[in-house]
């Protein structure tokens, strides 16, 4: 997994260099740093002309600059000329003020999880987080906490996705199954057990708000991955619940959760990862067991 990630990063670097060469962009780190807008340039482009000017303080980090250190840069945005969400402000700043501002985004509807970041001290999605209309206070925007930063508001998600892959998030059967031959039956009650679990969009807001995950990310799976693990353990169509639980039966994978509840408080989809982790602990300790699958009528 790590070797594959290294190859992907190397390929991405080669692709980036090719794009720079084709577009005439600066190829060296020093040239790249020099091409970034200065504070004076930003101030000139964000001249306060409206009545509802909002200041955004945004975390900046350029890994291509020699000896780069994180900084916080201020941008003024006229709310009368901007959409209502934080992502609207970020896009406006990138399009009209500073094209070097870097962040992830995709669906703009709270479905993909790409634009997860820390806004005003709370992990959330920029696309569904409304701009505070109080112009007397600035809004602070940082990347997800306790993650390596790729650039600006872009965190490195490699470890998070590697942990997700480790739980084998797909249905596994012990009996031969030919796709299309028959349906994998679920009763209404069995399907209802997945509600509040399958809706997770893997944005990592919960995991990166968890102190246990901050200090033990190499061993503790974290709220998001554990909730996904429970989703597959409890699925009536899956035959490998025992094996899935066995892989988590140690002192760190699940039991490092101290029920701090930050995960449930911050989830932008209003899910309850802490409850799912509690259910996993009950299964691991033998207090509860997975309900037997109902007989199939198919």
Curated annotation (Swiss-Prot):
User: One cellular component GO annotation, for this chain's record?
Assistant: mitochondrial inner membrane
Which amino acid positions bind [3Fe-4S] cluster, per UniProt? 210, 257, 263
Which EC number applies? Answer: 1.3.5.1
Q: Where does [4Fe-4S] cluster bind?
A: 200, 203, 206, 267
Keyword set for this entry?
A: 2Fe-2S, 3Fe-4S, 4Fe-4S, Electron transport, Iron, Iron-sulfur, Membrane, Metal-binding, Mitochondrion, Mitochondrion inner membrane, Oxidoreductase, Transit peptide, Transport, Tricarboxylic acid cycle
- Cofactor binding note from Swiss-Prot or TrEMBL: Binds 1 [2Fe-2S] cluster.
Q: Which GO terms describe its molecular function?
A: 2 iron, 2 sulfur cluster binding; 3 iron, 4 sulfur cluster binding; 4 iron, 4 sulfur cluster binding; electron transfer activity; metal ion binding; succinate dehydrogenase (quinone) activity; ubiquinone binding
**What does the entry list as the binding residues for a ubiquinone?**
215
Q: Which Gene3D superfamilies does the record associate with it?
A: 3.10.20.30, Alpha-helical ferredoxin (1.10.1060.10)
State the compartments where it is located: Mitochondrion inner membrane
Does this UniProt record's set of keywords contain Oxidoreductase?
yes
What the entry lists under InterPro entries is as follows:
2Fe-2S_ferredoxin-like_sf, 2Fe-2S_ferredoxin-type, 2Fe2S_fd_BS, 4Fe4S_Fe-S-bd, 4Fe4S_Fe_S_CS, Beta-grasp_dom_sf, Helical_ferredxn, SDH/FRD_Iron-Sulfur
Q: Extract the PROSITE patterns matched here.
A: 2FE2S_FER_1, 2FE2S_FER_2, 4FE4S_FER_1, 4FE4S_FER_2
According to its UniProt entry, the protein's GO biological process terms are: aerobic respiration; respiratory electron transport chain; tricarboxylic acid cycle
- Listed PANTHER family: SUCCINATE DEHYDROGENASE [UBIQUINONE] IRON-SULFUR SUBUNIT, MITOCHONDRIAL, SUCCINATE DEHYDROGENASE IRON-SULFUR PROTEIN
Instruction: Give a short account of what the protein does.
Output: Iron-sulfur protein (IP) subunit of succinate dehydrogenase (SDH) that is involved in complex II of the mitochondrial electron transport chain and is responsible for transferring electrons from succinate to ubiquinone (coenzyme Q).
Indicate what this protein is called per its UniProt record.
Succinate dehydrogenase [ubiquinone] iron-sulfur subunit, mitochondrial
Organism for this UniProt entry? Caenorhabditis elegans
The organism's taxonomy opens as: Eukaryota, Metazoa, Ecdysozoa, Nematoda, Chromadorea
What gene is this protein translated from?
Answer: sdhb-1
């Amino acid at each position: 997994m790590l070797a594959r990630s290294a190859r992907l990063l190397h390929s991405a670097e080669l692709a980036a260099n090719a794009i720079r060469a084709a577009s005439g962009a600066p190829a060296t780190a020093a040239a790249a740093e020099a091409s970034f807008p200065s504070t004076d340039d930003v101030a000139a482009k964000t001249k306060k002309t409206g009545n509802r000017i909002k200041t955004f303080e945004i975390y900046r980090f350029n890994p291509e600059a020699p000896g780069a250190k994180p900084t916080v840069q201020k941008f003024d945005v006229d709310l009368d000329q901007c959409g209502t969400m934080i992502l609207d402000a970020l896009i406006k700043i990138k399009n009209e003020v500073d094209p070097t501002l870097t962040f992830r985004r995709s669906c703009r509807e709270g479905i993909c999880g790409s634009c997860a970041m820390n806004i005003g001290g709370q992990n959330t999605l920029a696309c569904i987080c409304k701009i505070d209309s109080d112009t007397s206070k600035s809004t602070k925007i940082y990347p997800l906490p306790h993650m390596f930063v790729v650039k600006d508001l872009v965190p490195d998600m490699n470890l998070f996705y590697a942990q997700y892959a480790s739980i084998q998030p797909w249905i596994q059967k012990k009996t031969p199954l030919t796709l299309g031959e028959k349906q994998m039956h679920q009763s209404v009650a069995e399907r209802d057990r997945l509600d509040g679990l399958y809706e997770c969009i893997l944005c990592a807001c919960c995991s990166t708000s968890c102190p246990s995950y901050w200090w033990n990310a190499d061993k503790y799976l974290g709220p998001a991955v554990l909730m996904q693990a429970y989703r597959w353990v409890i699925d009536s169509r899956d035959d490998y619940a025992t094996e899935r639980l066995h892989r988590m039966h140690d002192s760190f994978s699940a039991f490092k959760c101290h029920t701090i509840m930050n995960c449930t408080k911050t989830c932008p989809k209003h899910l309850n990862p802490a409850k799912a982790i509690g259910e996993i602990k009950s299964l691991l300790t033998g207090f509860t067991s997975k309900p037997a699958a109902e007989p199939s009528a198919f």
